[in-house]
Amino acid sequence: MAEYDLTTKIAHFLDRHLVFPLLEFLSVKEIYNEKELFQGKLDLLSDTNMVDFAMDVYKNLYADKEIPHALREKRTTVVAQLKQLQAETEPIVKMFEDPETTRQMQSTRDGRMLFDHLAEKHGFRQEYLDTLYRYAKFQYECGNYSGAAEYLYFFRVLVPSTDRNALSSLWGKLASEILMQNWDAAMEDLTRLKETIDNNTVSSPLQSLQHRTWLIHWSLFVFFNHPKGRDNIIDLFLYQPQYLNAIQTMCPHILRYLTTAVITNKDVRKRRQVLKDLVKVIQQESYTYKDPITEFVECLYVNFDFDGAQKKLRECESVLVNDFFLVACLEDFIENARLFIFETFCRIHQCISISMLADKLNMTPEEAERWIVNLIRNARLDAKIDSKLGHVVMGNNAVSPYQQVIEKTKSLAFRSQMLAMNIEKKTNQNSRTEAPTWAAQDSGFY
């Protein structure tokens, strides 16, 4: 289902190395021409040092042609550069292998103290930091992400936050951990990078907006793989004004991922409250972005169009199956979406035909009855099933005036936040196209 594929939009905000997993996924799904995907990989590889990978892709794309001489020459050059950097970095690496240095790194949080210790014991010099950074970046460009992560960790521990390479080293460390699928480490790096961006007083508002936009896209890898990711994505994307503003201004397509995280969230009470806030954002941005996932929420909670919601739910399956980040959420999404339809339908109708519910839930009457029985048992819903008549009879779920007041006042802060962001959004729109992108960089993480 190429119509709803977001790979091109998302790739615009990713480092080129992070795009490769997305292209591999598309190859398996076969929704694009295979040769076009191979050509896309080759174009991405042209500005990296992964020459062997580029040669393999070239062979797949042009089986009847010889490997270009330029590629072979580039391989020779890369190997020579790697050997030279290894020789320059070897004495530095030996310092970090020293047991006493390892203990110091684990026990001290002060990079200056560690630097002074290395300078005193091993003759460590300031220029070694630049050498370490260049070697880490070169390792990354060659596809050796474990080596890059290790050296970038050493670099981060030693440099002050004001160092010219400090921020880009954080991006590189995060990318390396993502590509190695070390989700706990990636979550730590994501948090550290977010704090650095949010506390940066030097960057202009436009630069900060761009950095947050990159962070939003890179974070998708972490949030949809880490056990706590679906909670964290809601907190960051929906309830932190600067990030919600970035989504609305620069990348409204991210609403697909926020909506999926809300629908698949395992905390039922939190999910119901968050949905109300999410619906407001989806309504507000419906003129700039919509897909079956956001339209499902709109059909159900804005229009109360159950037939439309059922149709969109079927379309959601195709979208989820073909989305790199969301494919693992399919079962949770369908199960919870059916629950939402059921809950909303029950609020409107006192007595419901099981066959009608089955139709709304895209199930057989027998499946629907079993599903509702389990739902009533597990969720303790105030309802009874009349198997003889084939009806579900709802209990009295009247909301107390006290609860109504609480629900109405809960959204006041959120509405104020939305008003403030709308004003800021209008201010930023004129300069939207001027923002730099990672895709414009030559290679690597900066």
From Swiss-Prot:
SUPFAM superfamilies: Winged helix' DNA-binding domain. This is Eukaryotic translation initiation factor 3 subunit E. Component of the eukaryotic translation initiation factor 3 (eIF-3) complex, which is involved in protein synthesis of a specialized repertoire of mRNAs and, together with other initiation factors, stimulates binding of mRNA and methionyl-tRNAi to the 40S ribosome. The eIF-3 complex specifically targets and initiates translation of a subset of mRNAs involved in cell proliferation. SMART domains: eIF3_N (SM01186), PINT (SM00088). The keyword Nucleus applies. It comes from the Eukaryota. It is found in: Cytoplasm; Nucleus. It comes from Xenopus tropicalis. Its main location: cytoplasm. Belongs to the eIF-3 subunit E family. GO terms for cellular component: eukaryotic 43S preinitiation complex; eukaryotic 48S preinitiation complex; eukaryotic translation initiation factor 3 complex; eukaryotic translation initiation factor 3 complex, eIF3e; nucleus. GO terms for molecular function: translation initiation factor activity. Residues 222-399 form the PCI domain. Keywords: Cytoplasm, Initiation factor, Nucleus, Protein biosynthesis. Component of the eukaryotic translation initiation factor 3 (eIF-3) complex, which is composed of 13 subunits: eif3a, eif3b, eif3c, eif3d, eif3e, eif3f, eif3g, eif3h, eif3i, eif3j, eif3k, eif3l and eif3m. GO terms for biological process: formation of cytoplasmic translation initiation complex; translational initiation.
